[in-house]
Curated annotation (Swiss-Prot):
PANTHER family: L-2-HYDROXYCARBOXYLATE DEHYDROGENASE (NAD(P)(+)) (PTHR43128), L-LACTATE DEHYDROGENASE (PTHR43128:SF16). Its EC number is 1.1.1.37. This is Malate dehydrogenase. Keywords: NAD, Oxidoreductase, Phosphoprotein, Tricarboxylic acid cycle. The active site is at residue 180. It is an enzyme of class 1 (oxidoreductase). Catalyzes the reversible oxidation of malate to oxaloacetate. The gene is mdh. The modification Phosphoserine is found at residue 149.
């Protein structure tokens, strides 16, 4: 009897895509197909071969190939989209949204053709709007098109709390709701250190500073790098979500999900807590929010909807 190996395709072989592919292979979660445009096929093949040649040293058994041919992605269990352009000097936000939306639609058509049963994870920014664009183009059930930002934003939140308290990140739990931007909503009230509410451990003004740093977390990395944006933490976040799906772990994680009345919103993708498993989003978890938390989430939703107006 032949056992079918899991297969994950990563679209976009830049820093984030390549790092995601390598981490997936290192963890032996699946065989990996790294995809980029035809003009970058040789560099993509080179990166994949370089990763594969690390397998004897790292001790992992996973096949990795680079390609520009979507036929090589056929029958993927999960497809991760990291492709897209970054905002360039002189480019408006609307231009970025319109351009990346066109890229998403083209990629999605190829995914749907070759892997009609796949679960799609979207990272490309602005991620809430891009996930919506992929969903509309794919025609997949909503639970199989998911955006990634909450795991990353929550990881940043947990990191800063860990540093503040000088405690292991393993003991820090938290949630960040809303869109992936300055209006995201880190939920202090649902965040703990070893089961102890943060509000009993960290002064209010320090918590507010941590929340603000979390909101600006991506920009902080961009400013320090000088060129480009974060990729290690985004890649690790994608891998955590992919693992939850491939292993049907039913993890409670923040993810960008399609809402149909949850939290009082409909027809948009927004970061909320979900149960993530073998079918994708198994359930959206609705938290009880205080008035100020709901107001903050409303502002975040307004920002997401403003971006979505530009979708083509």
């Amino acid at each position: 009897m032949t056992i079918k190996r899991k297969k994950v395709s990563v679209i976009g072989a830049g820093f984030t895509g390549a790092t995601t592919a390598f981490l997936l292979a290192q963890k032996e979660l699946a065989d990996v197909v790294l995809v980029d445009i035809p003009q970058l096929e040789n560099p993509t093949k080179g990166k994949a071969l370089d990763m594969l040649e690390a397998s004897p040293v790292q001790g992992f058994d996973a096949n990795i190939i680079g390609t520009s041919d979507y036929a090589d992605t056929a029958d993927s269990d999960v497809v991760v989209i990291t492709a897209g352009i970054a905002r360039k000097p002189g480019m408006s936000r609307d231009d970025l949204v319109a351009t990346n939306s066109k890229i998403m639609k083209s990629i999605t058509r190829d995914i749907a053709k070759h892997s009609p049963n796949a679960i799609i994870l979207v990272l490309t920014n602005p991620v809430d709007a891009m996930t919506y664009s992929v969903f509309k183009e794919a025609g997949f059930p909503k639970e199989r098109v998911i955006g990634q930002s909450g795991v990353l934003d929550t990881a940043r939140f947990r990191t800063f709390i860990s540093q503040e308290l000088n405690l292991s990140v393993k003991d820090i739990t938290g949630f960040v709701l809303g869109g992936h931007g300055d209006d995201m909503v880190p939920l202090v009230r649902y965040s703990y250190a070893g089961g102890i509410p943060l509000e009993t451990l960290i002064p209010k003004e320090r918590l507010e500073a941590i929340v603000e740093r979390t909101r600006k977390g991506g920009g902080e990395i961009v400013g320090l790098l000088g060129n480009g944006s974060a990729y290690y933490a985004p890649a690790a976040s994608l891998v955590e979500m992919t693992e939850a799906i491939l292993k049907d772990q039913r993890r409670v994680l923040p993810a960008i999900a399609y809402l149909e009345g949850e939290y009082g919103y409909s027809d948009l993708y927004l970061g909320v807590p979900v149960i993530l498993g073998g079918n994708g989003i198994e359930k959206i978890i609705e938290l009880e929010l205080l008035a100020d938390e709901k107001e903050a989430l409303d502002r975040s939703v307004e920002s997401v909807r403003n971006v979505m107006k530009v979708l083509v």
